[in-house]
Amino acid sequence: MKCFYSFLFLLGSLLASGQTTDVKYLSGQGSDDAVEWDFFCTGGRKSGEWNKIKVPSCWEMEGYGTFNYGHDKPKADESGLYKTTFEVPATWKGKRIFIVFEGSMTDTEIKVNGKQAGTPHQGAFYRFKREITKLVHMNKENLLEVKVNKMSSNTSINEAERQCDFWVFGGIFRPVYLEAVPNNFIEYTAIDARQHGELNADIFIDKKLSDIKAEIEIKDVQNQTIGKITSAPINEKTGKISLSGKIDNIKPWSAEDPQLYTAIITLRQKDKVLHTVTDRIGFRTVEVKPKDGVYINGVKMRFKGVNRHSHWPTTGRTTNKQLSINDVKLMKEMNMNAVRMSHYPPDKHFLEVCDSLGMYVIDELCAWQYPPYDTKVGTILVGEMLKRDLNRPSIIFWANGNEGGFNFDLDPLFPQYDPQKRAVLHPWALSGNINTVHYIKYNSGIGNMFHGRDIFMPTEILHGLYDGGHGAGLDDYWDLMLSNPLSAGMLLWDFTDQAVVREDKNGFYDTDKDHGADGIVGPYREKEGSFFTIKEIWSPIHLPEHYLTPGWDGRFEIENRYAFTNANACNYTYRLAKINSLAQKTIQSVSGKIASPDIRPGERGYLQLELPSGWQEYDFLYVTVKDRYNQELFTWSYEIGTPDRLANRLLPQEGSTPAVKESIDNWYFSAAGTEVTFDKQNGLLRSVTSGGKAIPLNNGPVLISNQDIICKSVEYKQVEGNPQLIATYTSRNGKNTVYTFTWTMLPSGIVELDYNYRPQDMVKMAGITFDFPEKEIAGATLLANGPYRVYNNRMKGGSLNIWEKKYNNTITGESWDYPEFKGYYSLFYGMKLDCPTPFEVYSGKEDVTLHLFTPAVQEQYDPKRNHTIVDYPKGNLSFMNAIPAVGTKFGKAEDFGPQSQPHRARGNGPENNVSGKLYFRF
């Protein structure tokens, strides 16, 4: 950000010189400072009369017109009439004046003082300008009138921009301003700045002049001049001025180290300065080497990215610079390095933030699917997009449409404008020597994709929907891509849930059912569980899974997955934690620094921890890595002890001799104020009381199984003075023992449950389950991997810790109270359930997953075709050894890799059985 503020200071200094471009905003610069204009809507809500509206804005979000999602048919076709007044600064006398629109949906007709300013513009997402020099009054108020037709008179624009899978709006949704330039001015510049300082630039001026030259001066972030290049005379045939030279001692731009410079371009006629413009540039080289890879500054890349719409729930497509900063920071927090502009060029400030904070960008010409823009209007829009965005170092690819919305006649225009000759992609197709195929299944391809000879980089993959996709399956996909030399990475679909606040529906958050609920974050950027899964998997410093033993020497093998950064640029710390109760404030910790290892990009090495003596007595180890900017890459957590060790330390051991009673139907065990009732016929828990108060835990442990089993016997006995009840279940024919469990009442009142079962082969779930009424629950304190729930193909991203969770009935993507309460929690150690009579339960075995109630099913989507609804046990509290994976919007879970498959459990001996132990403290 230091680069950005230095640029603003420099720009302000130049504007004072008098030969620059002066700017006066007629609107706000974004949704956070919008200005009111007069407005008349021709149809829908609040139509038929003049009112006020904020500019910029989408008029539907301001209470006017009719909402439409892109799939709606037919669509509303109202128009908006705008009026405002403005004055022209006296200092602009003698200059040429233009009115500039950064974006207007869709056909836009401009009048100044009753006279039309040029031809109407068609196309929503593109900056356009019209000269109004002869239409304005210099010494009195001017009237601006704008008519915006939501539906274009050009059918191809409606097909490309409005028959689509996103919200479609109407209105002047980006800023409007006046520009004043000298009579002879620089129209735009096209700069190619390479990694070693080579610089080539084309300067385009508004009209041919004689004796014209240009100069580029390069200044660093300290505003020090580091080099200048002077042009040859203007090329009379092309009307452009070309410069070529080399700037020494530059630092190349990359997403890891986004070094920016200020380019000051001055147009001269002999010794007279005609016009000066500035731009921020970065020196970097992008190469696509066919059948090899994509290289940035000579280094082969794998892009870790996401698709992003320009969207905010209360303002639609109208955003602001702070929102762009926040979004890029969120992407970088997930350790992403790339973003695709789906499916249109974004706000200018978003690209500027990508330049400043460091993101690789695919900038896209709109066309959601077939048909695309026609060639006539498409030619205009390509020019408008590239003239605005050419010099952004963050942009490494152009995209001509999406998923079949390709007008191939427009492809040659991109290199005509772009001296960098960046590849032009056709997202979902093979183009620019890159296969951008969408939504590929794991390890798929015959002669292509994972099994081809072309570079492949899916520009959409692992389609999110509700709580599915994104991080689910990513671990397997990413490992496979890392092993494939032709993989250039991937871009997830998509960044944020596209919900709009419908004031016409009492503030309902509308995602158009399942169409817009695709995000890694919610409409207000609420983080879903996949956010942290992605963060761990895409961390550029990678720590593998590791099981700590008492004799461990404190050394981790780690991998540096940065492209340019040595591992010693990062900071490393550890923390040891000892759990003394299920309360955060009782955690006992000790922490320390770890020496930063010297590991070059792409190589492996070792991280050596110097742990204090007695570290083995702690329960968990946390290792945190922060980048050179002190931003956390990830914190990994590791088990030191076992759940059984922790449970025995936390639970009371003393008490009174347990009592036993028997009736015709039940056994009753009691000790230390706790009484439990078991069914004589099946051994299942029937009721619990503690201190005379009922705890409605019952009907368990039921084996989670599709097997037809029967209870063969329930046996009572005493072991060391403690009553036990042993239940044995067999297959219906009685030949094979399938399941046994043993209840033991301890003197402390702790009820111990030991169980052993033979799992079936090829199952989604395995474990035991109990009933407990959901209406009793206020929350829970978990000692487990959290705070988000997991699926079998989305285990990463959490942390072993104490998590205090309030009850909610969140439906991911329909309500956004995160983290969700219900679901699966891995590495379960213990839990205190907050209910009228709270109780605790602890695991005595590793690798148990808690099923904490069953999430509600989405209300807005047909469950028969929803691959993001997973299976849960019939009970509400379950202790699992196998849980299901979750799918994506377009695919069932089994399509997405090894972790997404049903669980295999083939084996013949008792060693293949699964055993577990639970301690209940009622």
Question: Locations of the language-model features?
Answer:
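Accessory carbohydrate-binding/adhesion or oligomerization-edge regions at the termini
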Residues: 18-70, 147, 151, 156, ...
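Accessory beta-strand-rich segments of carbohydrate-active enzymes
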Residues: 20, 31, 40-44, 72, ...
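An acidic-aromatic loop/edge-strand motif
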Residues: 21, 58-62, 66, 70, ...
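Substrate-binding clefts and catalytic carboxylate motifs of secreted carbohydrate-active enzymes
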Residues: 29-48, 77, 104, 167-171, ...
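Active-site-adjacent substrate/metal-binding segments within catalytic domains
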Residues: 61-88, 92-112, 118-121, 179, ...
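Beta-strand/loop-rich accessory regions of lumenal/periplasmic or secreted enzymes
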Residues: 103, 150, 254, 614-616, ...
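Beta-strand-rich binding/interaction modules
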Residues: 112, 198-233, 239-241, 554-593, ...
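Substrate-binding/catalytic cleft of secreted carbohydrate-active enzymes
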Residues: 328-331, 338-529, 533
